[in-house]
Amino acid sequence: MSTLQVDIVSAEEQLYAGQASMVIAPAAEGDVGIAPRHAPLLTRLRPGELRITPEGDEEEFFFYASGGLLEVQPHKVTVLADTAVRARDIDEAAALEAKRRAEEKLREQKDEVDYSSVQAELAEAMAQLRTLESLRKRAKR
């Protein structure tokens, strides 16, 4: 079976380095699935879930990335994330609170509110919560 070398790196640390049979990433224009021998690609990441399927029957790994770059070569995938965490390390209470605060700011509609940054905050919180939900669904199987 053919595999890819996958590296997930943030400014703080390297979160993952290993072989995988599939990577699913939140590219700017939509999710992309990357298998071995994929065509070269360089794209921005939007906030969302990264899913790594290791070779063999091992369980998938889930990560959250706040954005960054995805570089794909035929046998290598590199994620350079602005911020990234393992899904199991996401603070659900903090994500829910960030979501609540962003929604409140959007409802207030004050002149000094920077709507694009508030929408970005809301998108990040929602992406973290979706990543946690995916992890929980996989755990139930």
UniProtKB/Swiss-Prot annotation:
It is found in: Cell inner membrane. Keywords: ATP synthesis, Cell inner membrane, Cell membrane, CF(1), Hydrogen ion transport, Ion transport, Membrane, Transport. It comes from Halorhodospira halophila (strain DSM 244 / SL1). This is ATP synthase epsilon chain. Gene3D superfamilies: ATP synthase delta/epsilon subunit, C-terminal domain (1.20.5.440), F0F1 ATP synthase delta/epsilon subunit, N-terminal (2.60.15.10). The lineage of its organism: Bacteria, Pseudomonadati, Pseudomonadota, Gammaproteobacteria, Chromatiales. One of its GO terms (cellular component) is plasma membrane. One of its GO terms (molecular function) is proton-transporting ATP synthase activity, rotational mechanism. F-type ATPases have 2 components, CF(1) - the catalytic core - and CF(0) - the membrane proton channel. CF(1) has five subunits: alpha(3), beta(3), gamma(1), delta(1), epsilon(1). CF(0) has three main subunits: a, b and c.
